[in-house]
Design a protein with these regions (language model features):
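Long, structured protein-protein interaction/assembly regions in large complexes
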Residues: 1-215
Length: 215
């Protein structure tokens, strides 16, 4: 977790904020489009407030599956006089892989004023079997978002309610790492921790047990 100081009546109040570190950054994800995703050039990073999360257990090779949910986010985050509902315009799209076409489209939209800010993030991979999927499930329990996949839960079925908790405060995108700051649902986190303890107990190798313990 991270400790943040916020102004209070008497000096500062210290608040415990849960943090989720990710061993991936824009260097691993964005390729030649890195510069278009940077919004804090002084620190060479991207910071998005009140992020939402679209989590996909698969590769994104074209924009078509993304368009329905992107349109929903765009409409919901529009000014109230245009029918918006105050929804966040900041969306983190997490998947196994992004094609050049998808990266180019997201990058071009990111720099356009008045558009939603959707950025890609490749799921980290380790030597553990199905590590992409394990990470996505871990992440989903922290941010409160649904994991989509090509067969049982296609992206076209995504709704605003599938994009995570309102208590996620920020997403920091660095060169080789990322961090989510926010308050998860304690019951979701505890449920996932219990699952991981069970996985560790039946791990087929010492390495697998160690990697599960790390998570």
């Amino acid at each position: 977790f991270t400790i943040l100081e916020q102004p209070g009546v008497d000096g500062f109040e210290v608040e415990q904020i849960e943090g989720f570190p990710i061993a991936r950054g824009f260097e691993d994800t964005c390729g030649r489009f890195i510069e278009q995703f940077i919004n804090d050039r002084a620190n060479y990073r991207t910071v998005l407030e009140k992020p939402k999360f679209l989590i996909y257990n698969g590769k994104l090779n074209d924009m078509n599956p993304l368009m329905p949910i992107l349109e929903k986010v765009a409409n919901a985050s529009a000014p109230k006089e245009q029918g918006g509902i105050g929804f966040s315009e900041n969306l983190i799209i997490v998947a196994h892989h992004f094609s050049e076409n998808v990266l180019a489209t997201l990058a071009n939209n990111f720099v356009q004023p008045g558009t939603i800010k959707a950025i890609p993030l490749k799921a980290p991979i380790t030597s553990q079997a199905n590590s992409h999927y394990h990470f996505l499930v871990d992440l989903s329990h922290f941010v409160g978002a649904k994991v989509f996949d090509p067969l049982s839960a296609p992206l076209e079925s995504a709704t605003l309610g599938h994009l995570g908790l309102d208590s996620m405060q920020s997403f920091e995108y660095m060169r080789y790492r990322s961090t989510i700051i926010g308050k998860p649902d304690e019951m979701l986190v505890l449920a996932r921790a219990e699952e991981l303890y069970k996985q560790k107990a039946v791990a087929e190798s010492i390495l697998d047990a160690e990697l599960t313990a790390e998570r």
